[in-house]
Amino acid sequence: MKLTFLGAAREVTGSCTLLEAAGHILMIDCGMEQGKDVYQNVEWPVAPARLDALLLTHAHIDHSGRVPYLYKNGYRGPIYATDATTDLCGILLQDSAHIQEQEAEWKNRKAQRSGRDPVEPDYTVQDAVNVMKQFQPQAYGQWLTLFDGEAGCIEARFTDVGHLLGSASITLRITEEGRSPELLVFSGDIGNRDQPLIKDPACPGEADYLVMESTYGDRSHGPRPDYVAELTEILQTTLDRGGNLVIPSFAVGRTQELLYFFRQIKAEGRIHGHDGFPVVVDSPLASKSTTIFRENFSDCFDEEALALVQSGQNPLSFPGLHISETKEDSVAINTDTTPKVIISASGMCDAGRIRHHLKYNLWRPECTVLFVGYQAAGTLGRTLLEGAKEVKLFGEPVAVRASVRQLSGLSGHADQEGLADWLHSFSRKPGFVFVNHGDDAVAQHWAKRLQEEGYAAEAPYNGGVYLLAGGHAACCETGNTQRLVKSAAQPAPRSSAAYERLLSMGRRLMAIIERSRGGANKDLAKFADQIAALCDKWER
C-alpha cells in the first residue's frame, strides 16, 4: 500500500489523501484550501480520470470543495459518502460553484479593463450539478465491497464521528494478494462531545494504520457551558431594550443548533414579557440545510433530539420561526420594527445577507450582535469582536454602538481530551498514526504526545509518500517542508485556470493512451492520427 498526502498536512484545510492498494487508486476527501497557504501545494500525481474511487468523510467544503473540479477534469468514477453527506453536498457544492463563478466574473471585469486574459472558475454550477450523479450514498456501519479482483480486495465502512450531520470516519479493509487483511482508518473531523442535535463520535473499533485529525490537539474546551441559559440572558436583555439580536451563523450545522436552542427557550417559557418573539432565518442555504437535517433525523440525531421527533415534535421548528427565502423577504426584515432574532450567513460576516443586517443594526445601541463560531483573523467578524468602533459596509462607514457578544464553547471539533478518548477507545493500538488536519505546531504537538504514549506517530507534510506493510510505515518522499514566506520580490505569475485545465486534459489524454496499450492496431493508428491533427492545429 502507498499513501500520499495531498492536503491538510500541517494545515487545517484542503483535506485530500491518495491511496494506492490492491491494484487501485483511491482518493479520500477532496477539499478546498481556505485561508492562507502555509506550505506549498503539491500537484496531484495522477490525472482525475485515473482514479478508481473517491470517498468523503463529510460535506464541509474543506473536505469536499474540489469534487466538482475532479469531475470537470475527467473523473467519472463512484463517489462514496453517507446519505446525509450526499444530501448536503448537493447544496454546498452548488453554492461553492456559484461563488467561483461570481469571483471569476469579477476578476474578468478587472482583466478586461487592464487588457489581461480572462480567467475561468475552478468549476461551474453545472459541474456541481453533474458530479452529483456519481454519488453512491451509504448507510453507517455496513461493509461495502469497493473492488474484488486478482490484485486483492478493498472494502469500506462508515462510522458516525459526530462532527456534522452525516460525518464519518472511514475504515478501509484491504486484502492484497498473498497478505492478510489490514485496516486503514481515516478519522475525518472528530466531533465534540455533548453537542446538541447530533450523536457523539463513535469509535470504528480497530486499525492497523490511522490518519487522525488534530485541529484542537493542543488545547481544552473546558467545562461545557449552559448554552441555553447564556443565550436566554443575552436575548432577554436585548429584547428588553427594544433591539434586535443579530446572529452571524454558518448555514450548515451551527444554524440548526441555534434553532434547537431557541425551540427549547420558547418551549420552557424562558423569555419574559416578549411572548411570541420572532426568529428569522435569512439564508437560503441555511433553509435548505435545515430541511436536510429534518430528513436525516433517524440516522444522525442524538437520543434527546430523536425523542422529540418520536413524540411528534420538530426539534428545529417552533411558533414564531420565519424562513426568509427571497431578496424581498430579506429587505422586509429591517423595515419591520418588531424586536426579533435575525440569524443570517456568512458566519464571519465577510459575505452574504448578514452584512445588510449589520448595516441596519450595528449603529443601534439597543441591538446585540452575537457571534457563535470562530472568527478568523482579518474578517469583519474578528474586527467587531476586537472592539472596533466603526466599520465599513458597502463602502460606507457604520458606527458600532450595538453590544457585541460571543457565545462561548460551541465547537464541532473535539479538544485534546476528546481526541485522546476517541483514540483510546480502539480495541488495540494502531500500528502507525498519521497526524493531519492541524496547524503546523498543533499537529507536531499532538504527534509528540502520541509518541510519548507509545504510539508510532508522525505529522506528514503535503506531498509526503509512505509505504505501508505489516503495521509499519516507511516514508519514501518527505514532501514540501519549506514554509511559504512573503517576499518583497515580485511573485512569479500564476498559471491561469484555463491553462491549469489544459494541463489536466493533457494528463487525462495520457491516461487514455496508457489504457489503450494492446488495442487493435487500426484503432491505435486512428487515435494517433487524431492526436497528430490536433497537434498540427495548435503547434506554434
Model-derived segments and spans:
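Generic long, charged, amphipathic alpha-helical segments
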Residues: 392-423
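Short, surface-exposed amphipathic charged segments that create phosphate/polyanion-binding patches used
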Residues: 152-158, 292-300, 420-421, 470-481
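Hard-cation-handling environments
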Residues: 234-379, 392, 427, 442-444, ...
